[in-house]
C-alpha cells in the first residue's frame, strides 16, 4: 500500500524535475520534449492513484 503511494509521489517528483530542467533549455524542441515527459509522469501518477483507489474500494467490500 505504501509502495503505491510512494510510486505516485516519485512520478510527481520526476515530473517536477522535468519541468525545472525544461525551464532551463533554450532549444524549444528539447524543452517541449521534456514537458511532454513531465506530462507522461503526471499521467502515470494519476493512473497509479486510480488503481490504488480501486484496490482500496475492493478491499473494503
Describe the predicted segments one by one.
Residues 1-61:
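Long, non-catalytic architectural segments outside compact domain cores
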